[in-house]
Amino acid sequence: MTLVKYSTIAFPLRSFRLFIFVKKALYHNEPHSIDPFHDKNWIVKRPKFLNLPKNEHSKLDVFQFNFNKSKSNNVYLRDPLFRDNLDKAMQIIYNEKLSSLDAKQVPIKNLAWLKLRDSIYQQLEDPKQQTKNYVPSISEIIYPSSPGNLISLLINCNKIGNSVWKSILKNGQSNNISTLDKFIHVLQQTFDHMYEQEILPMMTNTDDTDGAHNVDITNPAEWFSEARKIRRHIIMHIGPTNSGKTYRALQKLKSVDRGYYAGPLRLLAREVYDRFQSEKVRCNLLTGEEVIRDLDDKGNPAGLTSGTVEMVPINQKFDVVVLDEIQMMSDADRGWAWTNALLGVVSKEVHLVGEKSVLPLVKSIVKMTGDKLTINEYERLGKLSVEDKPVKDGIKGLRKGDCVVAFSKKKVLDLKLKIEKDTNLKVAVIYGSLPPETRVQQAALFNNGEYDIMVASDAIGMGLNLSIDRVVFTTNMKYNGEELMEMTSSQIKQIGGRAGRFKSKSTSGGVPQGFITSFESKVLKSVRKAIESPIEYLKTAVTWPTDEICAQLMTQFPPGTPTSDLLQTISDELERSSDNLFTLSDLKSKLKVIGLFEHMEDIPFFDKLKLSNAPVKDMPMVTKAFTKFCETIAKRHTRGLLSYRLPFNLLDYNCIPNESYSLEVYESLYNIITLYFWLSNRYPNYFIDMESAKDLKYFCEMIIFEKLDRLKKNPYAHKPFGSTRGQFPSSRGRLRT
């Protein structure tokens, strides 16, 4: 996987300009550079006002609209009440939006005001806009995002009931809401939309001096100004697997009033949440798919939160933040979340938990940020040994408590079936695309002895407490998305280190002991070399500009610039910049997700940024469902999960023994449901009826568990890559999507 690297060239946001494919750009008759990264005085595009009377281009404090009565017969001239409300509302909007501005904001806000008046002039001369048959939706009233329908909204605003208007305007006192109040709301929202979506993206920010646009994008430490205002105490807890480092960090977290545990997986976040709850420590849960607020009698949420690292509220003030598995900051796909959290959390203490391999990297970053650094190193609590010989008799030589490691879903299920066929051992399985809840169930069955053997992918490397006596590697090679590669020593140590954890007894007199082996001498030799090898220190941290910075950059591009173009431009520029301390997150998966909704013009840029981080699995059924969900956002509809045409009829107990309904179909359905939860947490007005969604989720988990338990043949055997992944059979047995 290619990592994009920064260089040392300074790259201030205000000099980020659109590259236009012309040889010369003229501004005030002077030649300017066509390079958008160096031209600081180029206005990309000035709005035109084709309908606004010329005398109003320079005179702003005009609130009435002037028409030739002999040529026009629009609603403004016909209806005195409409005219009076519109004139008064315009004066109020002017006073609120333009009269008390900072001098730097005046020119751009003035353009938004002129754009609003120009649009009203145009619509008042358009008979189609003046129909009374139009019934606005509630979402259009709450957030008018189509300025071209403004007059229609104003004419028909009274068709929305007063109780709804009271909720929209948050007016719980007055029983009567005037038409003027409604006009003011619609015009305010339309003005804001025009300013943010039409005017601001067309203008440069040459006069900004507040620092928001002057961040050196090649120095990620500067992205987080609030964190730079304080000197934080960075406390590292480093050591191998099973050294008690996470426990010590959590003990500190429990002792403070305001804190956040940031885990790599939502099941780990849930585990910490459940642990705190069982210890009577108040704690919230915050993951992309699930939010639980621990409220007291007065409705106040708990001060502590357990969540995933991507959900850390960067600008919220904390006493302690724990970043678990900090070595993940070098991960090409998700590393940005750890790096940005380390650089940006506003916390008195930041506890970093992870491998020693990250130590030099953290030292360099702390030197850059000016924070205080304390290092705590821990030794493994038990012994870990690599056996001298491979497992005798292959699969038949396995024993209760073994964990067999393979690196594909097909191989994991093949091994489960073969072990259960050739031995009397019962096998649990864990792999990445299994629902977290199913993984927890499988782990529990293995830990309590109901199942004898665990067969797992590298998903066991973090996030699950497993009572493993011995880790058995089937291979030392792993597919990295492009080719088979030999596993790194760090990966082997992470997985092999799971052996001997959470064991209260052992053959060494009470000291927990774990063993590592393989089925083949060649693999065992490679594993031994990795376990005994010196630490491979990480050299770079993966990062990505925050949504706020991306949004500021987007204001330098003309309206309609594809989101993917912006992200690719950032990537290309940063590839030529900065030192080797930071690398840019891999864009492939993000661009693939963006491609599903980029053509939807009604989704604002800020929402497209948000949606680019959605957890969309690369399965046909999942991507199609996500596209439908995005259409809901674009149309501002309100829908429940059951209103979509998805095969929820397969969530039937009678489908469990039917092998034509494959395990992967249910994994796809599960991913669709969790994706719906993710979207509902961000768009609660569009995605509703969470109770039904929860019922579907629980039933899907149950069917996946039962299908694993009754597995007779591998559903992935002999399937060409990508041929029917995530598809489901129709009632006639044919595959459809």
Curated annotation (Swiss-Prot):
Binding site residues for ATP: 239-246
Biological process according to GO: mitochondrial RNA 3'-end processing
Start and end residues of each Helicase C-terminal domain: 390-546
Transit peptide feature, positions: 1-25
EC number: 3.6.4.13
EC category: hydrolase
Catalytic activity: ATP + H2O = ADP + phosphate + H(+)
Primary location recorded for the protein, binned into one broad class: mitochondrion
Molecular function as annotated in GO: ATP binding; ATP hydrolysis activity; RNA binding; RNA helicase activity
CC terms in the record's Gene Ontology section: mitochondrial degradosome
Subcellular location: Mitochondrion
UniProt-listed InterPro entries: DEXQc_SUV3, Helicase_ATP-bd, Helicase_C-like, P-loop_NTPase, RNA-DNA_Helicase, SUV3_C, Suv3_DEXQc
Keywords of the record: ATP-binding, Helicase, Hydrolase, Mitochondrion, Nucleotide-binding, RNA-binding, Transit peptide
Superkingdom, taxonomy of origin: Eukaryota
Domain Helicase ATP-binding: 226-365
Keyword RNA-binding included in the entry's annotation: yes
Cited function: Probable ATP-dependent RNA helicase involved in a variety of mitochondrial post-transcriptional processes and in translation. It is a key control element in nuclear-mitochondrial interactions.
Family to which the UniProt record says this protein belongs: Belongs to the helicase family.
Protein name per its UniProtKB record: ATP-dependent RNA helicase SUV3, mitochondrial
Organism for this UniProt entry: Saccharomyces paradoxus
Gene: SUV3
